[in-house]
Every structure is written in structure tokens, then in C-alpha cells.
């Protein structure tokens, strides 16, 4: 099938080009993309790939157009959110933790299917595709059926970030930290992931403190009901739980210092490979330091839960989103990086 895809080559401007997508295999689905979120992981991967041509994008939402012969539970015409790929067979997948799938790297970051075959060709030449099992910076994407979560009539530009960014922030709160009424959560960094965590915690009746240098993001967090400060160096109350979205070692240590005894810090920001942590303090105060990928979520369960909260007015994720045309990718990157927008979502031109 022909599709328009956003082809990236390192730091060079991205370009919309025509590509050929494979026909769906028995376990695959062809989805017409209606919206796709822009995530920091897309930009980090583009940088890591250097000049290798790639079709990225991993927060897609769209309509099922074709089904592989072995797909059950989906119908042509279903609107679906596309989340990360997982095998569905390993111990982690079977125990409800697909983000830690044994094949996670192969299925999400190899640029091809698990068997090594490509899914996207430009001018007959295979390019890096199957990113997070989808490569949805495009008008259409070929995905594994396990990655598709039906979402009904939710606006696609709101639903798309539920595939990764909003899923990560919300899941970190609901699945990993699990604070409740009477607890106080510190969120370090109020970008898309952090803001989704803020809204989710507030919907649980949790008191929330936010450290965020960008004034517009602080103002938004304050309007939602959080206490927002520019820096962790500001006077802050102690907290029962903390979530770091930055991965910066100095902020990790400051967040740990603000935890009450037996408190928990979850880390979702990917920073340097190493960091110095005061292990004795962790031991003596009974602190926990938790890693967290994709909110440790089962998308098929958490995405509908979050949509339900949105529909009831408990989770106004739509207020975090700014839309752009797919061809405006480079402008969206700049404006999101500069803090002019919180969550950029790209809409493929019809």
C-alpha cells in the first residue's frame, strides 16, 4: 500500500515522501492515521540513528482499514490507539507487565519486524520502520494487532498520546506509586508525561507539588490545583511519593531528600547511564527507588480507564494538546522544545 511518511535523517529537515507499506501479515493491522503525538523519544531516536533514514512516531491513533487473516477482536472501521509492541507470550507479558517484554528492544527499536523483515520502503529501499511496532508519522501504519486499543468516538488528537506519553505519566501514578488521599506527590518536570501524572494524581484526591522551570507549564499545573514552583531549590514540603520525568541525577537526589520515611521515587526520565545515589540514606529511611517504563501499564486496560476519566471530566487531557499538520513537524519540534506548547500532536493531511 502507498502512504505518505515523514522521513527523518538525523538533524536534517524532515520531509514528507511516498512510501510502500507491506501488506498485513496474519497478526497485523493496517491503520489509517488520524493523529500522532510527538514525544521526546522520537527526537532522541532520530539523533541516535544519525543519517540513517527513518520513519518514527509511536503515539498513533487512527482507523482500522485492513485486518490480517488471524486477527480477532478488531473490525474494519474501529478507531484505535496504537501503543508499544510486545510479544504477549513471555513471563512479563503473561503476568500483566508487557512494557518489560523479553522482546521489547527487538519489537520496538530494531527498525524491523522481529524476524528482521522491513515494513516500509522508500523508492524500493527499506528504511528504519516498525518504531514501537508502528512508525506512525505517516498517513498509514502497519502494526501488530496486540498494539491496537479500541477507543470509540474520542477525538483522535486527545487519544493519540495515550499510546505512550500520557500512558506513562498516568501509569506511573496508578500502577507504580499508587498514592491515595492524604498523600503528597512531587512531580519533577511538567511536560506531557509530568502533566498527565499531575492530572491523574489530582483525580485520585492526592495533593500534588510540581517543580517546573517553564512558567506556562507551572501556571497550567496551578490552575489544575497543584502547588507549582520553578525549582527543587525552592522551599518545599516533604512528600510521600515522587516522580522524576527528567532523568537528571542532581534532581533525583534532591527529590529523594524530600521524601518522608518509607517514601517512593519513581523514575521515568531517561538520563545519563550512571548517577550517584546515597544508598545509606535509602536504607536508613526505608526509601524505594523505582524504575518505570510505559507506566508499567497494560494498554488494553489503562487506556479505556483514562478515556473514561476524560469523558467524566476528571482528566482534562485535551487541555495539554496543541495540534499541527504532519508537514509542520519541524515547527512542532521547536515549539515543544521551547516550552511554547506542552504536547504537540500531528494531524496527517487528508
Residue ranges and their predicted role:
Residues 249-314, 347-350:
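Glycine-rich phosphate-binding loop and adjacent beta-alpha segment
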Residues 65, 209, 266:
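Conserved beta-strand positions in the Rossmann-like core of class I SAM-dependent methyltransferases
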Residues 139, 146-148, 152-232:
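Mid-domain Rossmann-like dinucleotide-binding core that forms the NAD(H)/NADP(H) cofactor-binding site
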Residues 22-36, 46-94, 99, 152-154:
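Glycine-rich beta-strand-centered segment in the early N-terminal region that forms part
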Residues 84-146:
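Cysteine-cluster motifs in flexible loop/terminal segments that predominantly coordinate metals
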Residues 3, 300-350:
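C-terminal hydrophobic helical "lid"/dimerization subdomain
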Residues 27, 234-242:
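A short acidic, Gly/Pro-enriched loop at the edge of an enzyme's catalytic core
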